[in-house]
């Protein structure tokens, strides 16, 4: 229940969007908190801002915007900590070797967290690389390796086999379609015979 109230405290109770750098938590004179976007919309339709809960009036001097209202320091400290700890994963497909780059969790000073490899190759040639140090390390089947020799061979073999299989599959499909066309052509030439081409 406490996490539910904490979660609702981190979102604007008007639009139900989470507070962020774009939607800053602004304190009204009555100490209720709303996001800056909702307050700006309220300010467009009214000269004064009335709290949606207690109807208390918050005056903003002419020429000033909602951004001049004080931020809610409690909520602001929570969202700044949570936003700095989060990272958005970015997946990049590398067509040369079929690897995908995934983000690596880093410490505040930019070093990898203890016990976390800077790069590893997982199933289906998925790789995670830390590009900050300029080196590529690969986690093989037996642990963290220094180079990429063995894994490069595996990736090259996988890519080669994928190409060979694709060529064989396309050739098989073309031969199958050619057989259908030749069969239909032979049936057309025997149009008036007693034997059916079924």
From Swiss-Prot:
GO terms for molecular function: ubiquitin protein ligase activity; ubiquitin-protein transferase activity; zinc ion binding. The keyword RNA-binding does not apply. It catalyses: S-ubiquitinyl-[E2 ubiquitin-conjugating enzyme]-L-cysteine + [acceptor protein]-L-lysine = [E2 ubiquitin-conjugating enzyme]-L-cysteine + N(6)-ubiquitinyl-[acceptor protein]-L-lysine. Keywords: Lysosome, Membrane, Metal-binding, Transferase, Transmembrane, Transmembrane helix, Ubl conjugation pathway, Zinc, Zinc-finger. This is E3 ubiquitin-protein ligase rnf152. The keyword Zinc applies. It is an enzyme of class 2 (transferase). It is found in: Lysosome membrane. Its EC number is 2.3.2.27.
């Amino acid at each position: 229940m406490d996490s539910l109230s904490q979660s609702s405290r981190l979102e604007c109770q008007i639009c139900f969007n989470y507070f962020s750098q774009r939607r800053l938590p602004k304190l009204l004179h009555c100490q209720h908190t709303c996001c800056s976007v909702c307050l700006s919309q309220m300010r467009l339709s009214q000269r004064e801002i009335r709290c949606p809960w207690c109807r208390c009036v918050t005056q903003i001097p002419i020429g000033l915007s909602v951004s001049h209202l004080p931020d809610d320091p409690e909520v602001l400290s929570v969202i700044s900590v949570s936003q700095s700890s989060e990272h958005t994963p970015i997946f990049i497909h590398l067509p040369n070797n079929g690897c995908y780059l995934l983000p690596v969790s880093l410490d505040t000073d930019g070093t990898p967290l203890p016990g976390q490899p800077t790069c590893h190759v997982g199933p289906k040639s998925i790789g995670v690389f830390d590009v900050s140090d300029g080196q590529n390390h690969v986690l093989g089947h037996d642990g963290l390796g220094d180079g990429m020799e063995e894994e490069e061979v595996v990736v090259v073999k996988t890519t080669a086999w994928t190409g060979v299989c694709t060529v064989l599959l396309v050739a098989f499909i073309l031969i199958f379609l050619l057989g259908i066309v030749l069969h239909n052509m032979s049936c057309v030439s025997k149009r008036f015979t007693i034997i059916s081409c079924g």
